């Protein structure tokens, strides 16, 4: 199950599914790798996709949700402990995981929908339906992480088949395939998201109403802002007294805090914290803008 902790306690292994989705450390990791990529060549040999949420990770979350819901059905929703592959999952952890995975899935699918509909002043729902149609036939089914290149399994299987049949015989042709997969990522991602939006929310995107789109956007807003608020709370822990050990050793708690802020800065002015707060404002405005465009079509 993605974004999980494994904890050993009293000779028992506890699985805490999805908990890292609300962790500051996860977001910092996702942000640091693109910053460390100092390649300057226009033609890059390694195709690396840095997206934290992608068909690859969201597919894993959807599978995890299915497993967790199945455990609830088998054992009961009020159980204090669930057992999965030689690990224990606390009932509270399972319920939290379903909530976190749900928010992350809403966030990704909503991002895809909003991106698809951005920048167009629609005059009719027919125009909306037309813009929602996928432009790539590739992208359906399971996706893989191939050393940083995120691509559909079906496309990779097709490459392997062509190599085995002798239709592809050079490294240059394979490199061209990888480059094409990387450059066409967002088209293929939308093909996948299109299917998942229909399956997950039970909507028909070829005839979806403006009101249904507004409902999906509001669900996306709630999830994005909800996850950001959880990150905000997690960041606040790093400014608690327990994190101030070694600061103002001989002083009072007040002096310890002043020493800590002198080195690390105040919580509200911390760059990560200000970025989270700005992200909430930007995403709320982005959702409101699409809602306004859709409400004209009611």
Question: Where do the PLM segments sit?
Answer:
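An accessory alpha-helical subdomain
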Residues: 60, 65-125, 131-135
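Glycine-rich hexapeptide-repeat left-handed beta-helix
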Residues: 1-76
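Short, flexible coil/linker elements and helix-boundary hinge sites characteristic
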Residues: 51, 66, 76, 110, ...
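Intrinsic-disorder/low-complexity loop/linker signature
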Residues: 11-12, 86, 166
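Charged, long alpha-helical assembly modules
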Residues: 124-126, 130-196, 209
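Short, amphipathic C-terminal "tail helix"
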Residues: 99, 129-134, 138-141, 277, ...
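Charge-rich, solvent-exposed alpha-helical interaction surfaces
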Residues: 64-70, 74, 97, 116, ...
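Charge-dense, extended regions
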Residues: 175-298
